[in-house]
Amino acid sequence: MRATDKQRGFTLLEIMVVIVIIGVLASLVVPNLMGNKEKADKQKAVSDIVALENALDMYKLDNHHYPTTNQGLESLVEAPTLPPLAANYNKEGYIKRLPADPWGNDYVLVNPGEHGAYDLLSAGPDGEMGTEDDITNWGLSKKKK
């Protein structure tokens, strides 16, 4: 080895500066990504509620009434066994499967509803009904029949 040859590479100080810069950038980006995840979850819940409303409307077109609270949203997948029975139930159902909300909870159907013909809601991120973060069909701009 010749004495004039220098080994090339990064110094410890240069590597530490790069790590600090990456840390600062990550601290700026991660909170924005987390906020977007929350918005995306809420938007998915809204989309699910709209899809369930459409399925409920199709059910009503065939059977002249919405499923009751006791029959629940399961009536959109399988014919209800509790009265009032659905005389003209579509043998394929009105939706292939019931979605869970983005937080893993079931959507709830209340019929008759307090805010319209029926109320459809998700408990929201906290998983508790009746709190401010609930996502509801009466909170959407679409008007119910």
Swiss-Prot record:
The modification N-methylphenylalanine is found at residue 10. It is a single-pass membrane protein. It comes from the Bacteria. Keywords: Cell inner membrane, Cell membrane, Membrane, Methylation, Protein transport, Transmembrane, Transmembrane helix, Transport. The keyword Electron transport does not apply. InterPro entries: Bac_GSPG_pilin, N_methyl_site, Pilin-like, T2SS_protein-GspG_C, T4P/T2SS_Core, Type2_sec_GspG. It is found in: Cell inner membrane. Cleaved by the prepilin peptidase. Gene3D superfamilies: Glycoprotein, Type 4 Pilin (3.30.700.10). Type II secretion system is composed of four main components: the outer membrane complex, the inner membrane complex, the cytoplasmic secretion ATPase and the periplasm-spanning pseudopilus. Forms homomultimers. NCBIfam families: IV_pilin_GFxxxE, typeII_sec_gspG. Belongs to the GSP G family. This is Type II secretion system core protein G.
